[in-house]
């Protein structure tokens, strides 16, 4: 999987790492698109940047997205508010790869204060190079979540009384 379009959004806590990731993606043949912050501002708030990156990723099938902040937690939550977005918090190479392979995640959240640059770039590389497995059991789970997102009706709990 090469030449991926990757939308990135970060607040002040992820700004410097986002800049490094953008350069790394360019050097490895990908097309990074910066959804902000476009300059460092210690008082900015992550939701706008993460929602912008997630919205653009969902609207561009086949693309991926990365949202960054201090921990990646709030950024992941913000991205997941976008209908159709599947954003996983990636804290290791393995979690980034599994986000793609098992969950067909289009986005990951990375904590800019949680990783060295080398660790973060390894997470990014795992995410952009791991293909979706297309395994039926994983697709079934994605479909259940998509149906809940569409209807707001929770799936039945197996074995629970009616």
UniProtKB/Swiss-Prot annotation:
What is one process in the GO biological process aspect for this record? D-allose catabolic process
The answer to whether UniProt assigns keyword Isomerase to this entry is yes
| Reaction catalysed by this enzyme | aldehydo-D-ribose 5-phosphate = D-ribulose 5-phosphate
Alphabetically list the UniProt keywords: Carbohydrate metabolism, Isomerase
UniProt: D-ribulose 5-phosphate binding residues? 11-12, 70-74, 103, 113, 137, 141
The UniProt record lists the keyword DNA-binding: no
Summarize the activity regulation: Weakly inhibited by phosphate and completely inhibited by iodoacetate.
Enzyme Commission number, as recorded: 5.3.1.6
Q: State the Gene Ontology terms under molecular function.
A: ribose-5-phosphate isomerase activity
Active-site residue numbers:
75, 102
GO cellular component assignments:
extracellular region
Classify the source by domain of life.
Bacteria
Pathway listed: Carbohydrate degradation; pentose phosphate pathway; D-ribose 5-phosphate from D-ribulose 5-phosphate (non-oxidative stage): step 1/1
InterPro entries, A to Z: Rib-5-P_Isoase_Actino, RpiB_LacA_LacB, RpiB_LacA_LacB_sf
Q: What PANTHER family does its record include?
A: DNA DAMAGE-REPAIR_TOLERATION PROTEIN DRT102, RIBOSE-5-PHOSPHATE ISOMERASE B
**Other remarks?**
In mycobacterial enzymes, the usual proton acceptor is not a cysteine, but is remplaced by a glutamate.
The record's annotation in NCBIfam families points to:
PRK05571.1, RPI_actino, rpiB_lacA_lacB
Q: How does it assemble?
A: Homodimer.
| Protein name (Swiss-Prot/TrEMBL) | Ribose-5-phosphate isomerase B
Q: Which organism is it from?
A: Mycobacterium tuberculosis (strain ATCC 25618 / H37Rv)
- Gene behind this chain? rpiB
């Amino acid at each position: 999987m090469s030449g991926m379009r990757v939308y990135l959004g970060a607040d002040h806590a992820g700004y410097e790492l986002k800049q490094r990731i953008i350069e790394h993606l360019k050097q490895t043949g990908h097309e990074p698109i910066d959804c902000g912050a476009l300059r460092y501002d210690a008082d900015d708030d992550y939701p706008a940047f993460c929602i912008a990156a997630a919205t653009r990723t969902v609207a561009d099938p086949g693309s991926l997205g990365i949202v960054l902040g201090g921990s990646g937690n709030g950024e992941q939550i913000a991205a997941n508010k976008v209908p159709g977005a599947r954003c996983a918090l990636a804290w290791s190479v393995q979690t980034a790869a599994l986000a793609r392979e098992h969950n067909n995640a289009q986005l990951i959240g990375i904590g800019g204060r949680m990783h060295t640059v080398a660790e973060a770039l390894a997470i990014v590389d795992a995410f952009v190079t791991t293909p979706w497995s297309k395994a039926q059991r994983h697709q079934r789970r994605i479909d259940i979540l998509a149906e809940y997102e569409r209807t707001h009706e929770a799936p039945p709990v197996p074995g629970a009384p009616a």
